[in-house]
């Protein structure tokens, strides 16, 4: 990779689940990192732990509590130093909440991104890696999902991702100096192997495995499985689960692409998944095996809006980013349990809001 030394990367949402794992990898590679996060759905403790894990590179991390909609604060940060690139994770991400509070999501995710892009443009910073999502595929009629599959977000959260993708495409079309990579994640799972950082959803979890984790540590009595009559191997929904460390690697690969292929990059999109589908019951069984815990199940009807089968075609990322997921479901569940057993209340405590 082009030498990381003296390169400073701005990471928005860097205190969050995927952000914190990516920040750690950047530090370990020798980058300087400035993290911006408003801590709405993240904990500053994640940043403190990333510092500890980074060892002698900890001093290369600078944290600022900032909301991306605060243009004046952003402008001051960009005026104070030069950023080689921006990795943009920041945003609200609970699908269910987005249906109940659409304006909150449009305001936070869209206005925050517009403000960020305006300030980047004003300061001549035109390299961007953006966290998009497989939610932009909606309910795919065919799997695996390729980067050319039809886009049809089914909820306000997914629509914010799709609008931002379009915004990035329009931005590059208007000014080819912009070099942008859009990463469509599938379902992140697991934690850093140290068990020191991991997923800590403030409030109610949004995804399957944090629910499983809460049942395993005694915070919930049972896991509710929604839908047992899908046309799948065991009747439950199938998703493409990917280890968060593999996802972090994908961001490093995207950053490398922005540097090394700068002349050929426009606004590119890549799926980040394993290319394999795993059912809800298969994930539960793998977690039970990894943890030695029995997860009581309650079966319920399908939830409106849940797709039957979603998994990625990953050939483009493998070919162009030289990236491929290394870890399987067993490692995801092993590392998730290592984190959950050491941090049953995430970064909080039993009497905190977590």
Swiss-Prot record:
GO terms for cellular component: cytosol. The keyword NAD applies. Transmembrane segments: none annotated. This is UDP-glucose 4-epimerase 1. GO terms for biological process: galactose metabolic process; monosaccharide metabolic process. NAD(+) binds at residues 8-39. Belongs to the NAD(P)-dependent epimerase/dehydratase family. Pathway: Carbohydrate metabolism; galactose metabolism. It is an enzyme of class 5 (isomerase).
């Amino acid at each position: 990779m082009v030498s990381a030394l003296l390169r400073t990367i701005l990471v928005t949402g860097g205190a969050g689940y995927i952000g914190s794992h990516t920040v750690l990898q950047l530090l370990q590679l020798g980058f300087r990192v400035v993290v911006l996060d408003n801590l709405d759905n993240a904990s500053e403790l994640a940043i403190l732990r990333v510092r500890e894990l980074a060892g002698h590179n900890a001093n290369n991390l600078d944290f600022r509590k900032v909301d991306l909609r605060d243009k004046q604060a952003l402008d001051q940060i960009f005026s104070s130093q030069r950023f080689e690139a921006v990795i943009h994770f920041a945003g609200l991400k609970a699908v269910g909440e987005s249906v109940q509070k659409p304006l909150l999501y449009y305001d936070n995710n869209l206005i925050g991104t517009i403000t960020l892009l305006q300030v980047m443009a004003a300061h001549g910073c035109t390299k961007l890696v953006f966290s998009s999502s497989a939610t932009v595929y909606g309910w795919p009629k065919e799997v695996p999902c390729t980067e050319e599959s039809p886009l049809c977000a089914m909820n306000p959260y997914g629509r914010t991702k799709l609008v931002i993708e379009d915004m990035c495409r329009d931005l590059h079309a208007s000014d080819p100096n912009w070099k942008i990579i859009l990463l469509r994640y599938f379902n992140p799972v697991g934690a850093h192997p140290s068990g020191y950082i991991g997923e800590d959803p403030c409030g109610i979890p949004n995804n399957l495995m944090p629910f499983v984790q809460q049942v395993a540590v005694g915070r919930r009595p049972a896991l509710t499985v929604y839908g047992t009559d899908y046309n799948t191997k065991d009747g439950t929904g199938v998703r493409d689960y990917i280890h968060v460390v593999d996802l972090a690697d994908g961001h490093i690969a995207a950053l490398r692409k922005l540097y090394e292929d700068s002349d050929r990059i426009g606004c590119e999109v890549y799926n980040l998944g394993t290319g394999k589908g795993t059912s809800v019951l298969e994930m539960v069984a793998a977690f039970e095996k990894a943890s030695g815990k029995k997860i009581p199940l309650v079966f319920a009807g399908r939830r409106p809006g849940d797709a039957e089968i979603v998994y990625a075609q990953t050939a483009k990322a493998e070919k162009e980013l030289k990236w491929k997921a290394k870890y399987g479901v067993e490692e995801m569940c092993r590392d998730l349990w290592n984190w959950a057993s050491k941090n049953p209340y995430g970064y909080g405590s039993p009497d905190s809001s977590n």
